[in-house]
């Protein structure tokens, strides 16, 4: 093939492979003119040059930062895992102890990163948290100690990380509303991560600590374009309970709960009580009912304790005179209400008396007043923290030492308010009025709506949230309850109430074996082998005695107006929850 023929063939191939020229259409759908095309081409070249320039500048900035001396090196970063290799003995400060009075002082503290905000590349704000105390801290770039690299790193610290911060306290010129320390802030000199976050948080602690009112208000404002707060439901919180327990509200709740236990123990120890520890597994159910957890105990059946009732009484028969216990109580009740759990903490006591069971009832009244006054005087700060999320009115204590009602007098108060109406067989009652009726108005136990109504009546009429109802009907009390000697339809028993909610049930116990067996049979409880040793304890002599059992979580719930009893338990148990 000649050279000319080759050139012709190549031209032919190029023609076949040549792509059609791009046709650019204008807004009118027609091809652009040459003038318009030229203008578009210039704009494209200009845009391309801009991108190339920005890329060069970014690369140059990166190189400058890499070559820039970090004069804060060693003042920030992740600390190695603490394996207790050294103990320098430095002095640490609590956030609660910091105020404007410390202006100019250097402090060292360990805290969690509650919130953070990077402002440009020269400033980072933190809210540092210890339990329910928070303080604002900031790292600001300067020429000598705080570098841009340090501030940038500060902005990368994950929320809930535990940090070691050293800084100077500065009096704030304005009130810092977002922190509990409102008149001072910390200007950071050094900051290290002690314990980083190694998984994504299921929710923010800040979100879990908001009140229902705050959430609703944000949802209403969202319609106007504002962002709304995240609603963290109770199940999500309980599924991730360790994180949830970090909220300031929960920290305050469980401080108060611990304070109640301490006050209970202090008062009883100062009145010659002995702390006891009874078995939580037994061969018989203490109440003689079916609401017990049955367990396999080697080759026989056992039960988880419903209460320490039987053992408290046996210890009284053993001359222990005054005993108390703080321990777990198990109830196999398939109830999913806001006020029931299958495991809770019981504050139980039992004591011998000399003449009348009212000696014990009066003592328990004084015990409760001591507990309530302890909360009011020593835990006012914690109560205020809880009220930010769960608003409540002050708990009203009676002007006198006690407010008591006979059961039939409480029934009378309810009748006057339109409750306790006789339910006639076959009578149709409106659904919204069902709780106004009962089969036996004089002797039926109070329903939950009736208890609440009575609480409101007593509050308005007697100006108290704390009161006692005495002489409950024998038919609604356990077999070991002493009948009223004057009217056996009633019993020597009592319930204590807070805001119309029962928090303690107690009574004089039967300490005569024959009467005890008689009552057991009358109520359908078999005095079998499982209860025989309990009965025998009274056959060898036992002083008259009375006592009661307090539900710890209920006291916390009702005092703080919590919407659900699960909020008063660190790791609640109910029919649907056995973890965590």
From Swiss-Prot:
ATP binds at residues 331-333, 339-341, 502, 551-554. This is Aspartate--tRNA ligase, cytoplasmic. Belongs to the class-II aminoacyl-tRNA synthetase family. Type 2 subfamily. It is found in: Cytoplasm. It catalyses: tRNA(Asp) + L-aspartate + ATP = L-aspartyl-tRNA(Asp) + AMP + diphosphate. It holds the Pfam family tRNA-synt_2. One of its GO terms (molecular function) is aspartate-tRNA ligase activity. It comes from the Eukaryota. Residues 15-31, 38-66 have a biased composition (Basic and acidic residues). PANTHER family: ASPARTATE--TRNA LIGASE, CYTOPLASMIC, ASPARTYL-TRNA SYNTHETASE.
